[in-house]
Amino acid sequence: MKSFALSALSTLVTVFALGNAHADVITQWTFNSTTPDGATGTGSVLPSVGTGSLSLIGGVTNPSFNSGVGSSDPAASDNSGLQTTTYGSQGAGNNGRGIEVKASSVGFEDVVFSYDLRHSNTSSRYELAQYSLDGVNFIDYAVFDGGLGDTWFNARTIDLSSIAGADDNANLAFRVVATFAPGTSGYLASDASKTFAGSGTWRFDMVSVSGTATPVPEPTSAAAGLAGLAAIGFLARRRRAA
């Protein structure tokens, strides 16, 4: 009887734990043209999946779109990336220039933010990734090293699965900003043979917010589980009566 009860309880726990166990894309920017036109120099800053906003901060500009070839975008053609520049002068604007992304995680848990980034030769070698739980105050997550010029660095990741308050949050936000070389008061160029210039470019692609849908038991499964509990109770009462 005991082994049966434990087995039934284990099954019930499994039933109520069932849900969407894989990560889903909540919001994503591929920067490809909404209507494919075969030109990588055109694109869109509207999300290709979900809803959210992406903005340039600190005076950074977007002079154009450019090829996303080399990023993780699976598009065989019409693969665009968001070209950004105007990162300021040497020694100024530390942690203040880059992009800001806002996307709700309501209905999701184990949230992850990821992006691909191409550093030009004279762009800032180091980028600081930040997150915000209220959309206003940002917390440093990690400094990433882009130590090769004219190179894509794919799947940069901010994993918030262990951060209290990131799940089911309508005010979630992220930033990727140029930062001084660690322990210094200035920027380094991605190509060690070059000198940093604010006119250097960062090109973004596959900017994504992902998460696991909050598990909700299916009605039929839940009913079956409750029926199992009722059966356990009935057998227990019958055993006591015997």
Where are these regions (language model features)?
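Terminal, low-complexity interaction segments
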Residues: 26-35, 138, 142-214
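Extended, low-complexity, turn-rich repeat/linker tracts enriched in Gly/Pro/Ser/Thr and Asp/Glu
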Residues: 107, 118-125
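Sec/Tat signal peptide C-region and signal peptidase I cleavage site
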Residues: 18-23
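Surface-exposed, low-complexity/disordered Ser/Thr/Gly/Pro/Asn-rich loops and linkers
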Residues: 54-106
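Short, tryptophan-glycine- and acidic/Ser/Thr-enriched carbohydrate-recognition patches
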Residues: 34-66
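Extended extracellular/luminal ectodomain segments enriched in beta-structured repeat modules
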Residues: 105-114, 169
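A short, hydrophobic C-terminal helix/tail in secreted or cell-surface proteins
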Residues: 218-236
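Conserved Ser/Thr-centered positions that define the repeating blades of beta-propeller domains
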Residues: 129-132
